[in-house]
Amino acid sequence: MNSIFKKIKNYTIVSGVFFLGSAFIIPNTSNLSSTLYKELIAVLGLLILLTVKSFDYKKILIPKNFYWFLFVIFIIFIQLIVGEIYFFQDFFFSISFLVILFLSFLLGFNERLNGDDLIVKKIAWIFIIVVQISFLIAINQKIEIVQNFFLFSSSYNGRSTANLGQPNQFSTLILITLFLLCYLREKNSLNNMVFNILSFCLIFANVMTQSRSAWISVILISLLYLLKFQKKIELRRVIFFNIVFWTLVYCVPLLFNLIFFQKNSYSTFDRLTMGSSRFEIWPQLLKAVFHKPFIGYGWGQTGVAQLETINKSSTKGEWFTYSHNLFLDLMLWNGFFIGLIISILILCFLIELYSSIKNKSDLFLFFCVVAFFVHCLLEYPFAYTYFLIPVGFLCGYISTQNIKNSISYFNLSKRKLTLFLGCCWLGYVAFWVEVLDISKKNEIYARQFLFSNHVKFYNIENYILDGFSKQLDFQYLDYCELKDKYQLLDFKKVAYRYPNASIVYKYYSISAEMKMDQKSANQIIRAYSVIKNQKIIKPKLKFCSIEY
């Protein structure tokens, strides 16, 4: 009987890891968010692993620094209460991502304390399989042999993306997998020949992304490795790795441009010298930080910060939902002072983690985290659960090295964990129900709009996805019907969170008609003109007596 239960447990763990890995290769299909289904599948994998392991562990331990999570959650609650966070949906997402990060950390932390490396090895193997499949998809993007709904068949300006649809995300996945491969080799889980072949494939795939964040990661990781291990043989290994990597960085784009006449790859020199819009937006967003230095603009509302502070000299033709820098986002969301404190805590945690590492296997796992955080300084992989979960798990797994005595952690009763996991499962199911409701509402509105300018109001109770629901209403419904159903503040919130011509003009019209909040309405008209790179034109006011 015990053997049957053990098999069931092992199969369930495999299924959880499988869901986590499959999030990287399923296509982007949701109308609400291009990565929604991928992220939900990753969360499903985490919940399965936690549920199985909660019965397996004799005791569940939580580090004392968990209180910092509670501090951040408290800040988000305050922002919701005072109205800085516009929709419950944004509050829910922010809390959920922190809870997901904490649960991932908790799983890794207790997995290591219980002397088990089963999950980390299974994650390593599933990532290796996923990246090899993604490598084939990336090759197909270059040669375009197979066209299929399930394949992201076009590259990103000649840069490989696989089914992630974004080259830097694909690059970070490859780097994480490369160091998980090194971890397996260090644990003697594969031989030298297999290791060398897979390593070369991973490096080649990474070079195809032409990711500059990967270049920075390789330089930083090489230095961190040599700081830990300073023997001559280690120096030779680092030099050899860098020779292979940088040679491929230079040669692979030339090779593809030679083979394919359309020259669909940037040269390495082009990638090295070309600019980036993120460097143009950062100065403007830094000004926005000091515009609200104490409480910020609310978690997840970087776009609001940009719209509120934009002017004629700001970056044109760009609207950012994230600043492309984790620390800048934290300052925008929380204000300069609290954001700076959280940023320093993150850096201190990483430095302490690195200092506590005593062996190569842990160092390779730490390099997975480093690759992720370097990417966080140039983009926003922290906004995707399929990255957050494995990185949180690895942080928890490595951080057990910091435990010096029993004061460093406290026990969590299985009853409390079971209750909490039960709430997480209920929240997960409730979220899926609302996703289906919103998808239905979007389909109904879109179908009606095909045949008539007048769309009938579709009323559904949305307790979680209130922002998406209101966005659909303001996008499709007549101005007069919106006036009857919503307040001026609702017009403002939707316009600043989901700016498009229809929604912005409706907000401007009601503000002018009521002769209230006109400064904010004029600001978003100016801001919208800048992000669309158009001349500032005051829109025609909408009136109930006129159909449009």
From Swiss-Prot:
InterPro entries: O-antigen_ligase-rel_domated, PglL_A, WaaL-like, Wzy_C_2. Pfam families: PglL_A, Wzy_C, Wzy_C_2. GO terms for cellular component: plasma membrane. Keywords: Cell membrane, Glycosyltransferase, Membrane, Transferase, Transmembrane, Transmembrane helix. One of its GO terms (biological process) is protein glycosylation. Disruption phenotype: Loss of glycosylation of the ComP protein. Its main location: membrane. It is found in: Cell membrane. Coiled coil: none annotated. The chain crosses the membrane at residues 8-28, 32-52, 68-88, 91-111, 119-139, 164-184, 189-209, 213-233, 239-259, 331-351, 363-383, 418-438. The keyword ATP-binding does not apply. It is a multi-pass membrane protein. Its EC number is 2.4.-.-. One of its GO terms (molecular function) is glycosyltransferase activity. Belongs to the PglL O-oligosaccharyltransferase family. Specifically catalyzes the glycosylation of the pilin-like competence factor ComP. This is ComP-specific O-oligosaccharyltransferase. The lineage of its organism: Bacteria, Pseudomonadati, Pseudomonadota, Gammaproteobacteria, Moraxellales.
